[in-house]
Amino acid sequence: MGGSASSQLDEGKCAYIRGKTEASIKNFSPYYSRQYSVAFCNHVRSEVEQQRDLTSQFLKTKPPLEPGTVLYEAELSQFAEDIRKWKDRYIVIKNDFAVESYESKEAYQRGAVPKSRILPAGGKVLTSEEEYSLLSDKHFPDPTASSEKNSQPFVLLPKAFPVYLWQPYLRHGYFCFHEAAEQQKFSALLNDCIRHLNHDYMKQTTFEAQAFLEAVQFFRQEKGHYGSWEMTTGDEVQVLSKLVMEELLPTLQTDLLPKLKGKKNDRKRAWFGLLEEAYNLVQHQVSEGLNALKEECRALTKDLEGTIRSDMDQIVTSKNFLTGKIRAMVAQPAEQCCGESVQPFLASILEELMGPVSSGFSEVRALFEKEVDELSQSFHATQDSAQLKEGLQQLMKLPLDSVKMEPCYTKVTLLPERLLDLQSRFRFPHVDLVVQRTQNYMQELMENAVFTFEQLLSPYLQGEASRIPVAIEKVKLRVLKQYDYDSSTIRKKIFQEALIQITLPTVQKALASTCKPELQKYEQFIFADHTNMIHVENVYEEILYEILLDETLKVITEAAILKKHNLFEDNMALPSESVSSLTDLKTAMGSNQASPARRVSAILPGAPDNELPSNEVFQEPEEKKEQPGVPGSLAISASSCPSGGDGQVSVDHSAGGPLTVENTAGPLSSHLSEVEAGGTLKDEEPTCQSPEPSAVPGSLKELKKLLTVTVSVESAPVVENDIHNGTPVPQENIKEEESKIHPEASHPAAIQQDSCEEREVREKEAQPLEAEAPGVDLGILPEGRGSTSQSTSGGLTENTSCPGPIEEPFEAQEPAEKVLPAIVSTEDSPQAGGEAEHSVTVTPQEDATLSSNPICPMESNEVAQASGDQEVLGGEDSSALGMDTEQVNDTHEHACQWLVEDTLSTDILAVHDFDVSSPEQPSEEW
């Protein structure tokens, strides 16, 4: 420190500074003690009620860096203020964001104490002498130097590319570089350090941090200062020290500035040195006083904890009652103030906020996609797995690459220009704080994106090299979808915080003279034992916040409904928790974690080329639900099958809903409701269950010989494949099969008898049959009178061209009944009028298990995307009747016949030939 400054800050001034600091801490203590008790009570309440943060997030949260991680190290020129000379120093910046200066690299490596250590909280980075001179003159209120011009710069530069670090109440830092690239890298990293040091403390969720910030707010309100404060940066010692310096500064300027002698640069240097010495004195005393104050508060809350926990219900009830009383007094003037001074401007402020903020997040997305594409192209050219892993490690460092991230941050720096009117209308000059918070969120989201990408891709790096580029592309698309949702969530949070931060001071100041004086009379509603945990000022502020929050959420929700800047609505069918399960990349064989739609698409001959089989990494079980243009896959659940008698099966193709089947054959409907109540059926397959009739004791054997399902559709004749034998079925066989079917109506007596026998069999828990019909195609031929139509909601209407693959419902945890497997063969028979009767013969087998994966080929633009988590069909609402039903009359006593008429029109009807065994699960690699 220079001699001039040392001579001015004598012992008398030091004593004065200590006295003012002690008085400030004493005045601040009651505010901090009150807020400490309130925050501790809220903390205990949250712990007791087990409150959770319901903020939804898709991307995995990147773990914090290990302490001591080096972000930057290089040798450069630094101006040594003590000797006023430029020296070559070895600069190291770790993830505590302190700038450490060492004599040399060897000194750093052997663990020497740094020559200087700078925490640049509240600082500003400049790269030109002109910018620095303007800023430093602004904070040097010297009346005698108003007309004086500097003949030389404040610091002579040894190199062409300087970096100036301006700091409030501290001496400034000066660095110099040979090349512009080095200057850009260092200045960008310094900006990162400043952003984190400014806001990382305020992001803490500890009740002590919340208590301190609330205490600072109430302390400043008592002096007539509302809203944010540009000095609320750094940790609690730095913030409180700046609060004291704010009171000291006028006195120091009056007493010391006139005594400074010399040229302007000399006086300026002396003034900055004087401020630094005063600030160090204040900071030391504040640190001691704040630690003592914390110990007192901790002792107080330790005594209160028992009361808080035992009286929690009473405390909550008392606070709610007090809130109602104060709200009745505040609501009318607060709403009037909002309606006149805030609400008319919220939409325009939001519009100005959305542009730069959304542009910044879009730039982050584009940067991530660009880096991943370069990684993929590099591997495609070299096929070098080692180089790919190295590139992946570099990708993980992308959020810390200040040079690459700087163009993203620059997009948001346009915000102060867009919000110039706020300074006059709402007196909000601190838009820079909003910019810095937004930039921190952008960096955090990039960290989550690259971390999620690395987690999802890592399992595939050991696989075949030819599949890695496809895996990279799939994982990239998956992460980008997650990024879009998380970006929308974070941006809405930024908008909400900014709108309240900008407009709340206006409401607070408007009501301060009318409502605040009335608060004292409401203290009578607080029990004496609870006066430490409930304060009327806090309740009053919460009410104002909630009123304003409602107004801000209205305009944000409206913007989301209008899809402005790709904002998503809050009521979308998305998970409320982070998709952390994506680390479980391996799906066990037979597991139901994988989407049924994905398993179907893995064996679809007509599936799109880009739909490669995969595990959970490529599935979108939740996001698909939010896409209105993607129809859900249809699934059919056969609940029961009558053994003789009239049976009616209805198939519902209502728009946007699942395909349900309901048997309405008299007493058998009770059996249907049983299965529906039980959820999904065993092995995710449609099951045909038939009770054992008493008319023929050997009915099970008879059913093994023949169990027929008849599907009546309007179509032209098509060639079907025998699923069991894997060979086409000639027309002669179709006619023979038709001869086995008796379309005549059965007698009512037989129905009644079968119903009685069915109840007897259920009571004995007889083992029914299970018919698993693979490859049964419910797509139909086009009708001459109908045309393809598809509902805008993404579901399929009654005349949809193709219902898409009929999807297997998920396996029930507790199947209602155990069933025997069966082998099913399908046949078509032409009928008059252009109808084709599609029959399915189900032959029970002991060891055969068949899957039901009907396939419907469609045009590429008509392929219905399968949703990830499908509802169990037929088990939700037994009243969902099919839209097209037809009676099935059968005189055969032991045949189970379904007649399903589907009037959906398609170009062709095709049944693909599959193995009898269950569909092969995707490999662990895919």
From Swiss-Prot:
Residues 604-699, 719-889 are annotated as: Disordered. Keywords: Cytoplasm, Lipoprotein, Membrane, Myristate, Phosphoprotein, Stress response, Translation regulation. Residues 784-797 have a biased composition (Low complexity). The keyword Kinase does not apply. It is found in: Cytoplasm; Membrane. Residues 733-745, 756-767 have a biased composition (Basic and acidic residues). Induction: By endoplasmic reticulum stress-inducing agents such as tunicamycin and thapsigargin in liver, kidney and cerebrum. It comes from the Eukaryota. Residues 661-672, 840-854 have a biased composition (Polar residues). One of its GO terms (cellular component) is cytoplasm. It is a lipid-anchor. A lipid is attached at residue 2 (N-myristoyl glycine). PANTHER family: NIBAN FAMILY MEMBER (PTHR14392), PROTEIN NIBAN 1 (PTHR14392:SF3). Regulates phosphorylation of a number of proteins involved in translation regulation including EIF2A, EIF4EBP1 and RPS6KB1. May be involved in the endoplasmic reticulum stress response. This is Protein Niban 1.
